[in-house]
Amino acid sequence: MHEAQIRVAIAGAGGRMGRQLIQAAMAMEGVQLGAALEREGSSLLGSDAGELAGAGKSGVIVQSSLEAVKDDFDVFIDFTRPEGTLTHLAFCRQHGKGMVIGTTGFDDAGKQAIREASQEIAIVFAANFSVGVNVMLKLLEKAAKVMGYYSDIEIIEAHHRHKVDAPSGTALEMGEAIAGALDKNLKDCAVYSREGYTGERVPGTIGFATVRAGDIVGEHTAMFADIGERVEITHKASSRMTFANGALRAALWLKTKKNGLFDMRDVLGLDVL
């Protein structure tokens, strides 16, 4: 990798998250915007990435070909769609590039492809890159160990109308953190929908509820409810810049890693708490 600073490539440069990532990359010390990518045929191809993001001229032209920019970046940052991310993953694996993956909605095969690639390249893969959310995940593990065996657990998440997957990747990660603390597999205890006559709540399950409305950036709540009291742990994001800054922080952290699969708790050192 480049000795002076980390050079990053941003996928989906014209999207909401892509523009935030470009702004963050141009502003963060130790980071250089090396490349910005958009899909073939996009009207944004040929634009200056910084100007596209509202951050001023960057000198980096939006392109569609990874091959054309392979010498311009050390770490590839991807918050797009699973099918596109897996294509980028194969390229990065072939060329020894690190990856920061914030894409959600992968099936089991997609997750396995990421695990296999991490044997050769360094990857930070997380559903949410905000510091606050990752602190919350640690709190959920601790709450579950104390209250999870006897309380009813529900996870409620809300996002903007354009989000295409549900429950959110963060909500699923919350469920996995809680289930893991209880020595369970989330697949065996998750309840993703309720409609009509459902009967009484099955003890030991983890329920999920999803809201899609307006321009909500992201809200997540885990509820531990017992008779007479309940505990709610909530995180609310008001700007995507918190995710972008976290992703760039992860890219900087990858500078010293050769291979391996990591998440934001590794980046933040939360596993020691």
Curated annotation (Swiss-Prot):
Pathway: Amino-acid biosynthesis; L-lysine biosynthesis via DAP pathway; (S)-tetrahydrodipicolinate from L-aspartate: step 4/4. GO terms for cellular component: cytosol. NADP(+) binds at residue 39. InterPro entries: DapB_C (IPR022663), DapB_N (IPR000846), DapB_N_CS (IPR022664), DHDPR_bac (IPR023940), NAD(P)-bd_dom_sf (IPR036291). Keywords: Amino-acid biosynthesis, Cytoplasm, Diaminopimelate biosynthesis, Lysine biosynthesis, NAD, NADP, Oxidoreductase. It holds the Pfam family DapB_C. It catalyses: (S)-2,3,4,5-tetrahydrodipicolinate + NAD(+) + H2O = (2S,4S)-4-hydroxy-2,3,4,5-tetrahydrodipicolinate + NADH + H(+); (S)-2,3,4,5-tetrahydrodipicolinate + NADP(+) + H2O = (2S,4S)-4-hydroxy-2,3,4,5-tetrahydrodipicolinate + NADPH + H(+). The keyword GTP-binding does not apply. Homotetramer. This is 4-hydroxy-tetrahydrodipicolinate reductase.
